[in-house]
Amino acid sequence: MPASFDTETLTGLVLAHLNADPASLHFAPISTGKHNTSYRVDSNQGRFVLRIAPPDEAGFLFYERHMMRQEPALHALIRAQTTIPVAEVVGHDFSRTRVERDYLLMTALPGTPLSDFPGLTRAQLRRALRQVGELLRQLHALTAVEHLGEEAYGYLGAHRPMEPQPTWAAAFRIMWNMLLDDVVACGCYAPGEAQRMRDLLDRHLGHFDRPVVSRLLHMDVWSQNVLIDAAGNVTGLVDFDRALWGDVEIEFAVLDYCGISEAPFWEGYGAERDESPPALLRRQFYLLYEVQKYMPIRVWRRNDPRSAARYKQQSLALAAGLL
């Protein structure tokens, strides 16, 4: 569960970056956050969101440690190069001098999370999904060559959980193995079970070794991270902290899992999906990458080994289809 902070601490964090009247500050917890501790901040300077990262001893996947540190640069890039509605980061501090956590302060976006919208109609949902497709098409137009200066792949933000790789196949192999290390560390896979998963990817790695443009991927687009207005128009995309640079197919697999990639999404995205046998095989691996992460999450952050066991069974069933 996210922690809570007293008003004095929150006020100090905000005033370090915002010239606001302290008496005008009002804080309200944001309940949809599952990882960070977040607050809506009302002030005489406007409305903001304060996000405070978990403590270092919290259970992290390999790419989650310090992942907030990549958000300021990503938000600046997306705001400059696209029309995607993302918040402006007005301040951040990763020095741990004010609080023993990373934190950032950003402008508040209008709208309600799609997951929380009361009485959502089919028309509103179709409009929202179509617009998500349009917005992700813009995001995916941002390439590593143009914006990072090299065709590199992987988690390339300031948190640097891995070294940049020259090919997508090399990057995904590292990501796969590091995630399996986490699944072993949380006790859900025995080393032998993890080795079989490692060998499974290696047997099929040739299907990943192909020309792939390294594109910016959100990797966490689900209903809680899409804000909409009363008509179903998208007013914000949030939580870019899990972003990576690589093959758009892995983004599509996450969208499948999160229920976003319905027909209206593809209408908005404006491109056909590769349905070739190699693409379908890669899709299964990308789905496995998404599903397996929930084992350490359920053990380390939810203390729910029973749920983790269900994700293990789902993962083993998916892997059996790749043998």
Indicate residue ranges for each PLM-predicted region.
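Surface-exposed helix-capping loop/turn segments at secondary-structure junctions
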Residues: 20-22, 82-86, 141-155, 183-190, ...
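Juxta-kinase regulatory segment immediately upstream of eukaryotic protein kinase catalytic domains
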Residues: 1-25
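Active-site Asp-x-Gly
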Residues: 168-172, 181, 214-216, 222-281, ...
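ATP-binding pocket architecture of kinase catalytic cores
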Residues: 28-173, 178
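Short glycine/proline- and charge-enriched loop/turn segments
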Residues: 51-59, 111, 243, 247, ...
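Active-site acidic catalytic loop and adjacent metal/ATP-binding pocket
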Residues: 31-41, 49-50, 89, 139-141, ...
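A conserved long alpha-helix in the C-terminal portion of kinase-like catalytic domains
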Residues: 16, 186-196, 202-203, 207, ...
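ATP-dependent phospho-/nucleotidyl transfer catalytic cores
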Residues: 117-122, 157-215
